[in-house]
Amino acid sequence: MKTCWKIPVFFFVCSFLEPWASAAVKRRPRFPVNSNSNGGNELCPKIRIGQDDLPGFDLISQFQVDKAASRRAIQRVVGSATLQVAYKLGNNVDFRIPTRNLYPSGLPEEYSFLTTFRMTGSTLKKNWNIWQIQDSSGKEQVGIKINGQTQSVVFSYKGLDGSLQTAAFSNLSSLFDSQWHKIMIGVERSSATLFVDCNRIESLPIKPRGPIDIDGFAVLGKLADNPQVSVPFELQWMLIHCDPLRPRRETCHELPARITPSQTTDERGPPGEQGPPGPPGPPGVPGIDGIDGDRGPKGPPGPPGPAGEPGKPGAPGKPGTPGADGLTGPDGSPGSIGSKGQKGEPGVPGSRGFPGRGIPGPPGPPGTAGLPGELGRVGPVGDPGRRGPPGPPGPPGPRGTIGFHDGDPLCPNACPPGRSGYPGLPGMRGHKGAKGEIGEPGRQGHKGEEGDQGELGEVGAQGPPGAQGLRGITGIVGDKGEKGARGLDGEPGPQGLPGAPGDQGQRGPPGEAGPKGDRGAEGARGIPGLPGPKGDTGLPGVDGRDGIPGMPGTKGEPGKPGPPGDAGLQGLPGVPGIPGAKGVAGEKGSTGAPGKPGQMGNSGKPGQQGPPGEVGPRGPQGLPGSRGELGPVGSPGLPGKLGSLGSPGLPGLPGPPGLPGMKGDRGVVGEPGPKGEQGASGEEGEAGERGELGDIGLPGPKGSAGNPGEPGLRGPEGSRGLPGVEGPRGPPGPRGVQGEQGATGLPGVQGPPGRAPTDQHIKQVCMRVIQEHFAEMAASLKRPDSGATGLPGRPGPPGPPGPPGENGFPGQMGIRGLPGIKGPPGALGLRGPKGDLGEKGERGPPGRGPNGLPGAIGLPGDPGPASYGRNGRDGERGPPGVAGIPGVPGPPGPPGLPGFCEPASCTMQAGQRAFNKGPDP
């Protein structure tokens, strides 16, 4: 009992030390494959300043075991401690790396091999290599062999004569017990020393070693008799260190403590009384990783990953489609006419050669449309083209409205031209004109830069975007992955230099029509073609997009306030529009009431296209005017005086994009305008862009309880739990009724001799006997009076029972008695501690029964990192949308600049589409 207090203290201290010791061991060193400490390309440096400065090489990283675990090729398990990570290598994986990638200059003369691993199942009885280096023909050169048949560890190496030498360490039964073990072998110049669990086992002499063949492979976990077969085991740590004495300084804190059994075993005592509650225990160590959860929903597309390393040259691709015409090369010298040869087999269509100086041939049949080329760089501004001939007379325009002149009614003959009006609103998009004739060839653009030569290969599987790391070693050959998603379009490469003129190839057969290509980039604006013939009146087009804002107009005179209209219904709040261009600085307004400081709002989304405006009244039909001939352009006249505000002019053509004006001062809030009439239903607008991810919504109300599901199948039987903690001692039970006297038991078998009493014990017993019977002994020593010898008396009655004597010497142990009757079950013990998480079981059989109801929709994930992707291709036009609710009429816009009118369009009906961008009603 004196040592019982040491046990909880021992575990209390260990619970604090274990995380620190485990954490120190868990961080495996990751060193480069080659050390360049001495300027050479050797594995270990020749100059050894200090043993602790020598490098080590983590074989788990070199064999990419951890990466294979992330790809689920192998299983990641708990190691020798709760904080350790290990890898369960099965017999279906092959860890094999070219030796040249790991040890380009071979192994050093002195080094040490260290590993922490565990064998389970049938591996305990197998003869296998935990690490081995093979030559180019597959023969062993260096290796560490674990032989479960002879319970030994064998270090094999290649001698100077090329023969395989071995150093066998035997009698290692403690290594084959399904527990975690740590073996280390220090290879010195003339000896090899084995350490098992940081205990030195033996040092064996070894012969000088020859160089290894680096054209072979380094492997992990292979059978000794068949190196192609893998052996299942669990690997936590494997290291090659340049210090051969490293095993002497290594510790084994990561290994679990092994409790040795006691020499004697007593019978189990009765349960003790319940003690007082103990002090609160220390914080528990972090738990191990939980089991993998269900597959989550597909996340949003991630940002484009960094450019991967160039792949290996792919297999030759299929013949590509004919490329675009190349640049015109210099004229070659005419060759001599050769003799006519025999007709050969049709050859493979050659690449398009440069035009020669042959006689023009007859026009060929129209060819198939080529693939659209990549958008070239914008060339320099060309010289102005020559003035084109006047176009044919246009069709008669619609009848104009009755004009006014200085307030007079209709002019008797013809009204003089009025002042130039303000530019009208942009007109609706016109119908597509007929294809114009080919214009004059433009000037040759500048020579483009040379493009990179692309490699033709099959489409490879797109890997997950990883961090840009150092170039790793060649990994194991994996299975061919699924076809990845289409990558982003690359930047167009620069124009390549013209190649040498090719030989004139034979005319190949016309090729089959290729598939429809993707929509090409918008080309440069061509030279305007000649006016085409008048086309039939087309259907009304869809609403055109808003035009580019015009130049800021001059400040107009304030209009007269209109009569107040009836109070309209409260309109729906409009979508925040796109910020307008910067206006010109307005006049300083009156100081308004100071508003409350508002918070900075988020950027608004692009507004949707509003409904068309109200249809204005149709004017009276005017008389058709006679069309005059187009006169020459007159010289610009002198600037006239500023006239009075004229009547609105004819709709002007869209002006060039204006420069953004200065930001104007905050204007005074105007009075609400009169209620407008109900506008016509507009056509459905184009689908807007996808909005940003909204904030997480509030949790919804609790749903009603679902129907109880069908009972599931009975699960597999769980593993037996750990024995519970010994329960408290129960209260003494009532005294039982005296039982009947049992039958005399059989004599026991002669037991083993008891323990011999010590000399000290004998002295104590003798002293106690002498003290108790000293008076009787002294009386017996007196000389008695001499007398006649009397007759022996009758035996007296039995005296009273004497006092209980002292404990005698321990007797010899008797034979073991017959087993007693099974006693009643004991009291229920306290709940035992939670056991360690067991290994992940095999996948069970598929369940039966109908599928369950789908789970609740999870909350949206956190927004991904901000990135700026490239603009995607224009999408197809969507179906017409539902007409939106008419918006609140906006405030009147500022007056525009004075408009202008081309003579060819002066006869258009004034105001026909001045304020209506939609079709006629």
From Swiss-Prot:
Segments of this protein annotated with the region Disordered: 254-759, 783-905
Region annotated Nonhelical region (NC1), chain positions: 902-921
Amino acids binding Zn(2+): D213, D215, H253
Organism lineage: Eukaryota, Metazoa, Chordata, Craniata, Vertebrata
Organism: Homo sapiens
CC per GO annotation: collagen type IX trimer; collagen-containing extracellular matrix; endoplasmic reticulum lumen; extracellular region; extracellular space
Protein's name in the database: Collagen alpha-1(IX) chain
Glycosites: N171
Domain notes: Each subunit is composed of three triple-helical domains interspersed with non-collagenous domains. The globular domain at the N-terminus of type IX collagen molecules represents the NC4 domain which may participate in electrostatic interactions with polyanionic glycosaminoglycans in cartilage.
Signal peptide: 1-23
Post-translation changes: Covalently linked to the telopeptides of type II collagen by lysine-derived cross-links.
Subunit structure, as described in the record: Heterotrimer of an alpha 1(IX), an alpha 2(IX) and an alpha 3(IX) chain.
Keywords from the UniProt entry: Collagen, Deafness, Disease variant, Disulfide bond, Extracellular matrix, Glycoprotein, Hydroxylation, Metal-binding, Repeat, Secreted, Signal, Stickler syndrome, Zinc
GO molecular function: carbohydrate binding; extracellular matrix structural constituent conferring tensile strength; metal ion binding; protein homodimerization activity
UniProt disease annotation: Multiple epiphyseal dysplasia 6: A generalized skeletal dysplasia associated with significant morbidity. Joint pain, joint deformity, waddling gait, and short stature are the main clinical signs and symptoms. Radiological examination of the skeleton shows delayed, irregular mineralization of the epiphyseal ossification centers and of the centers of the carpal and tarsal bones. Multiple epiphyseal dysplasia is broadly categorized into the more severe Fairbank and the milder Ribbing types.
Ranges of biased composition (kind: Pro residues): 273-285, 298-307, 387-398, 794-804, 888-897
Biased composition annotated in UniProt, kind: Basic and acidic residues: 479-489, 833-845
Residues covered by region (Nonhelical region (NC2)): 757-786
